[in-house]
Amino acid sequence: MKKVEAIIRPEKLEIVKKALSDAGYVGMTVSEVKGRGVQGGIVERYRGREYIVDLIPKVKIELVVKEEDVDNVIDIICENARTGNPGDGKIFVIPVERVVRVRTKEEGKEAL
C-alpha cells in the first residue's frame, strides 16, 4: 500500500475530489496548509503598499491506495489540478507498512 499526498491549489480541490471519487477513490483526508516552492512567495498590493506573502495557502489531499492504483491516482490529480503555472503543487508517494480500521481491527487492503 502507498500513501499519496498531493499539495494543490485550493481552487482545484473540488474538481480533484470529484474526479477521484468518480474513479472510486472516495476515502481521503483534506487539510488546509501553507507553503512555498522554488518560486518563493508572491507580492501583493494593498492600499498602495506592497506586501510579500511567503507562505501561500494550499490544500493537501492524502489517500492510502493499493500499489497498483498509484499511477492512476497521480494521473487523475495531475489532469485535474494542473494550470501550467508555477505553484500547481507536488505529489509525494510514501510506503505504508500497516493499516488498521479502528472499529473492526481489520488490517491491510480490507481496512481501506
Curated annotation (Swiss-Prot):
It is found in: Cytoplasm. One of its GO terms (biological process) is regulation of nitrogen utilization. GO terms for cellular component: cytosol. Formation of the GlnK1/Amt1 complex is decreased in the presence of Mg-ATP or 2-oxoglutarate. The presence of both effectors abolishes the formation of the complex. InterPro entries: N-reg_PII, N-reg_PII-like_a/b, N-reg_PII/ATP_PRibTrfase_C, N-reg_PII_CS. ATP binds at residues 29, 38, 64, 86-90, 101-103. PROSITE patterns: PII_GLNB_CTER, PII_GLNB_DOM. Its main location: cytoplasm. Keywords: ATP-binding, Cytoplasm, Nucleotide-binding. SUPFAM superfamilies: GlnB-like. ADP binds at residues 29, 64, 88-90, 101-103. Pfam families: P-II (PF00543). GO terms for molecular function: ATP binding; enzyme regulator activity. 2-oxoglutarate binds at residues 52-54. Belongs to the P(II) protein family. PANTHER family: NITROGEN REGULATORY PROTEIN P-II (PTHR30115), NITROGEN REGULATORY PROTEIN P-II HOMOLOG (PTHR30115:SF11). Homotrimer. Interacts and forms a complex with Amt1. Involved in the regulation of nitrogen metabolism. Regulates the activity of its targets by protein-protein interaction in response to the nitrogen status of the cell. Regulates the activity of the ammonia channel Amt1 via direct interaction. This is Nitrogen regulatory protein GlnK1.
